[in-house]
Amino acid sequence: MLIQRIDIFCDYVLHKPLERVLHILDNIEDYYSEFERVKKDKFGNKKLNKPQYEHLGKYWTRIINPPRGDLKGIHKSINKYLVEKIRMPGYAFGGIKGKDNIRNARYHKGQKYIFQTDLKDFFPRITNKMVYKMFVGLGFSHDVSAMLTKLTTYKGHLPQGAPTSTTIANLVFVPTGMALQVIAEREGLRFTTFVDDVTMSSQTDFKNVVPEIIKTITSDGYKISQGKTTYKSGITEITGVKMLNNSMTVTDKFKATYVNEKDLTSPRAKGLLNYKKRIKAVSRAKKK
């Protein structure tokens, strides 16, 4: 049973009196930082905006708005409550305990045909209205839903860098995700999401289904990244893991990153090596 009264929710979940929470909401601008961060891949390499701009040093950037002070603790409490009380969809692998990008890739191991797309500007496109509708749909009262929405959205959308954003994004995406799950079950496909990455795969060619998959995503207000939308057979990459015929390994980009490490005893180099070992271990492990 979800808590329905905002005063009780503040006391027992947020560990703050209602008056304090209302004060934070009245001064919400004071509780968010804002800075620009260069996008990096899973190995810590900066992402170039366009390959031809490499000599100019132009990189992809994103605006980060992490909560600070009491609001940061409130976000952590909200996230803990949601994770404990709400069952996450089985297809979701991002931001969920016991799941990660490697296990997401492993779910598609051995599949011959693979469709992938990236949800462009995923967090910024999730509006406060979508978040409020999600909370009400979960069974929270309108008062609690309104308060949670105001606490977890900033400037009208989900903020990048907030502890709650990935969990909330997973939950907001559920109607679209379940529609994609219906398509997957009908066509005998495997389907997963890893935050803003959507993957479907099969042993048989399903190219004729791809337009329906894309339409299902975009009709709910999401936008796909054309440059990251692919349909392939054979060797490919899924969420930073290279997929071979029936095994997984590190990507060519990872190999280049590791080779270029000057100090192989550094924490970064050790982290890269452990990542490689994890892919190997997960690839060999039997599916439960």
Ranges and model annotations:
Residues 1-55, 59-162, 171-184, 204-288:
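Right-hand nucleic-acid polymerase module
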Residues 168:
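Conserved binding-pocket/active-site segment within a compact domain
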Residues 190-194, 228:
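Short beta-strand
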Residues 196-202:
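Short beta-strand->loop micro-motif that forms the acidic, two-metal-ion catalytic signature
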